[in-house]
Amino acid sequence: MNDMNPGFVMPDVQSSHDTRQIPIQRVGVRGVRYPMSLQTPSGVLSTVGTFNLDVHLPADQKGTHMSRFVALLEEEREPLNLAQFQLLLEKMLEKLEADAGRIEVSFPYFVSKTAPVSGVQSLMDYEVTMIGEVRDGHTTVRVKALVPVTSLCPCSKKISQYGAHNQRSHITIDAELAADTPVEALIRMAEEEASCELWGLLKRPDEKFVTERAYENPKFVEDLVRDIAMRLNEDDRIVAYTLEAENFESIHNHSAYALIERDKRRAG
C-alpha cells in the first residue's frame, strides 16, 4: 500500500491555491530548542536557543512550508552576532519564498564575574533575546536583556532607625541598535545604575560590601528607569529602546513597576 510508482510525484499541498483570499500576517513554528553559538567580545559562547520563526503568507497560498524553518536552523553553523542574525533572517525569507517574516530567539547568556572584595570568580546568567523582523521592506533587529539587580527603598531608609527594605529587581532593556553592540554593554548599564548588582558567588566580606553598597545607593523604581534611560539616551549605538523595571517588593505581595520608551529618530 505504501509502495510508490517510480514516476509518482508527491503532491505539494501547502503550495496549492487557497480560495478564501485571506492573508496571514504571521505563520510558522514556536518553541524550537536548538544548540547555537554566539560571537562575544571574549570569544564564542555555546548555549541553547528557543526559536520562534514565522513569515507572511499570501492570500492565495494554502500553507507555508513548516519543515523549512527547522531545516534553516539545521543549516546554520556560524556563531551569531547582529550581522549574522540579520543574514539568518534574510535566508529564512529566501527559503520560505516570503516577503516578510520574523525570528525571535531567547537563550541563557553567561558572564564570568569577580566578587567585589574576595575576588572569587563565578558565572552569572542573564536572559537574552534577539528579535529580527522584515516588514514592508524594512529590517529591524533588536536585543533584549533581562538583568537581575538589587534595589533598596529610599523612603524606608529615610524613616527607619535600623536598615531599609530591599529586594531583587528585574531590569529589561529592549534596544534597537545602530551597531553590533555587545549585550554586555546593556547589562552593565543596568547593573551600574542599580542599588547594587548581583553575583553568583559571594564570601562574607562580599556580602558586607553588597549590603552597604545598596544602603548607600537607594533607588525607587522610578530612579532605576530614569538613571538607565539617561545612559541609553547618551549612547549613539542605541536607536530606540523600551526600558522596564520591576521591583519584587519584600514588604508587599505585589511589585512596583516603571517603563520608559524612546525612539531617537522621532523628535522629543
UniProtKB/Swiss-Prot annotation:
Gene3D superfamilies: Urate Oxidase (3.10.270.10)
Residues under site feature: May be catalytically important: C153
Pathway annotation from the record: Cofactor biosynthesis; 7,8-dihydroneopterin triphosphate biosynthesis; 7,8-dihydroneopterin triphosphate from GTP: step 1/1
Signal peptide: none
Enzyme class label: hydrolase
Tagged with keyword Hydrolase: yes
Catalytic reaction(s) noted: GTP + H2O = 7,8-dihydroneopterin 3'-triphosphate + formate + H(+)
Keywords attached to this entry: Hydrolase
GO MF terms held by the record: GTP cyclohydrolase I activity
Top-level taxon of origin: Bacteria
InterPro entries linked to this entry: GTP_cyclohydrolase_FolE2, GTP_cyclohydrolase_FolE2/MptA
Family stated for the protein in its record: Belongs to the GTP cyclohydrolase IV family.
Function recorded in the entry: Converts GTP to 7,8-dihydroneopterin triphosphate.
The name this protein goes by in its record: GTP cyclohydrolase FolE2
Organism name: Ralstonia nicotianae (strain ATCC BAA-1114 / GMI1000) (Ralstonia solanacearum)
